[in-house]
Amino acid sequence: MFDMYIESGGKKLRCGYTTGSCAAAAAKAATYMLFNKKDISVIEIDTPKNIKLNLEIQDIQVEKNSISCSIVKDGGDDIDATSGLEIFAKAEEIEEGFELCGGEGVGVVTKEGLFVEKGQPAINPVPREMIKKEVLSVLPKDKGVRITIFVPRGREIAKKTFNPRLGIVNGISILGTTGIVYPMSEEALKESIRIEIRQKSVNNKDLVFVFGNMGERFLRERGYKKDNIVVISNYVGFSIECALAQGIKDLTIVGHIGKLSKIAFGCFNTHSRVSDVRLEVIALELTLMGYDLELVQKVLDQKTSEGAVRLLGDDFPMLYERIGEKVLKRLDIYAYGEANFNILMYYGSKEMKLLYESKNSNLFD
């Protein structure tokens, strides 16, 4: 077991290692065994983080001209669909040089805009370099080797990853920029958002941001079919910056009033631990509109923005328009006027109802 820990939220959490580290270790081990004609049980690799890993080799398979073996992915205490997967590498002797291929269960890139060219196996640049470096460190100078990375359960597990959204088919991606998995990593989630924005920007001049699956469902149930939706979680500001970096000038944000109201107060990370001003935004607008303090207090006494909307009923379209206009103003300020923004605000979960749509929105035209 990988014995490296970090502190997060007062808890001690165990780190893990990436699919890229697993692939590099398996490739190095298979190459070593192929040319040295002997089995080994542990292999050491370096990582871009300058942390050495000693990983246990599994499932050694010897054939006439090749050897394959696996490393089990250990995600530590991170919630990771690939944790526990066997990542295999097959080493075959060739006349000269080094070749890297993707086999069964390693995804194939089908769209432009990712870090790997269209049609190539989804082995990201850093893992590619790691694999090459580790293999060449044990490859005899007068020999050549072809490495094939494969993941027997890759197709199955890929359905639980971002790959289907990114146009990566038939398997998982071999990932990792540091070689180490840090539990509950905010950076890992933000990087996945950055990648999706980059990929969706290739064939689209505009993007639609949603906070989660409910926002996407809201659009699909109303017949929206374009492939320009990006799930941004709570990272509104970060996602805007990524879109601007890709030259995107038209952005629509679709969200529940509980999320969008936070932007009206200038909160660009909408996680409840960072900002929770949903009821305060509604209460302030009611006060500014001249409603009595008894109603304002009833709103503040609600547990959720959903409860506040249901309490108020159907007679407050001007309230949602005022909140929506403040959201648009905040977005414009954040982007320094460099993008055109629209918003769609809804409430509900099973049956979602539109509360406000900005005047220039044309998603359903």
Swiss-Prot record:
Keyword terms: Cobalamin biosynthesis, Methyltransferase, S-adenosyl-L-methionine, Transferase
Catalytic activity: Co-precorrin-5B + S-adenosyl-L-methionine = Co-precorrin-6A + S-adenosyl-L-homocysteine
Gene Ontology MF terms in the entry: cobalt-precorrin-5B C1-methyltransferase activity
SUPFAM superfamilies given in the database record: CbiD-like (SSF111342)
GO BP of this protein: anaerobic cobalamin biosynthetic process; methylation
Pathway(s) the chain acts in: Cofactor biosynthesis; adenosylcobalamin biosynthesis; cob(II)yrinate a,c-diamide from sirohydrochlorin (anaerobic route): step 6/10
Gene3D superfamilies according to UniProt: CbiD-like
Catalytic activity, EC: 2.1.1.195
Enzyme class: transferase
NCBIfam families hit by this protein: cbiD
Similarity field: Belongs to the CbiD family.
Designated name of the protein: Cobalt-precorrin-5B C(1)-methyltransferase
Organism whose genome encodes this protein: Clostridium perfringens (strain SM101 / Type A)
Gene: cbiD
